[in-house]
A protein has these predicted regions:
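Fe(II)/2-oxoglutarate oxygenase catalytic core
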Residues: 1-143, 147-212
């Protein structure tokens, strides 16, 4: 993945609900994408290399086997490289929470993230409301759901990538679409029970952590 994406790395962007996609000091990294070869066999007028297409299919199939979710319709693998001082401040992976249009979109139901190298110092992935810090280890993966069964944002998933103090960090993200899971993870009976406001939910979990 590193060798395939290194020639295509560019400064990473973030989604700003007021200004759209833009560069931000909240996220200091470079990234590139590997796209589904069955949906995008040609990128910028060039056919995807066979080894790249094979790698995508193999890893995507492994993800489906591990999670039981449908990998079709994902955004592709986003490969990120963080240098010294590189970081990603607190954010949610779900997009509906950040979208002020009021239109329900195909949101990021879940995130699959895996580390492509060991980091000398720094670079932990931190979920502050869950009191969890995950050190980057080559070959390790992290998986979590961004949404409740009802489709509402799970505010416990606020997370960040800590600054790199020594070395560099390579990490790959794959966001799994919600709409494609209708026959794999349908809404459950009583799934709309998460009816509290975002602030109520945040206050609840912060109080819970403070009591630990």
């Amino acid at each position: 993945m590193k060798s395939l994406t290194t020639p295509h790395l560019n400064s990473a962007n973030v989604f700003n609900p007021d200004a759209g996609v833009q560069q931000s000091e909240d996220r200091i990294s470079n990234n590139a994408w590997l796209y589904d070869p069955d949906r995008y066999p040609i990128i910028s007028g060039v056919p995807q290399p066979p080894e790249q297409a094979h790698l995508y299919r193999v890893i995507n199939k492994r993800l489906e086997d591990c999670t039981g979710l449908n990998g079709v319709g994902t955004e592709g693998f986003q490969v990120n490289n963080y240098g010294i001082g590189g970081h990603y401040l607190w954010h949610y992976d779900s997009l509906y929470y950040n979208d002020k249009s009021g239109t329900y979109k195909n949101d990021r139901l879940a995130t699959w993230m895996f580390y492509l190298n060991d980091v000398v110092e720094g670079g932990n992935t931190v979920f502050t409301r869950l009191n969890i810090a995950i050190p980057p280890m080559k070959g390790a993966a992290v998986f979590w759901y961004n949404l409740h069964p009802s489709g509402l944002n799970d505010f416990r998933t606020l997370h960040a990538g800590c600054p790199i103090l020594q070395g560099t960090k390579w990490v790959t993200n794959l966001w799994i679409g919600e709409f494609e899971q209708i026959f794999h993870k349908p809404c459950l009976k009583g799934a709309d029970r998460e009816t509290s406001s975002p602030h109520d939910i945040i206050n609840y979990y912060e109080a819970l952590l403070a009591s630990m």
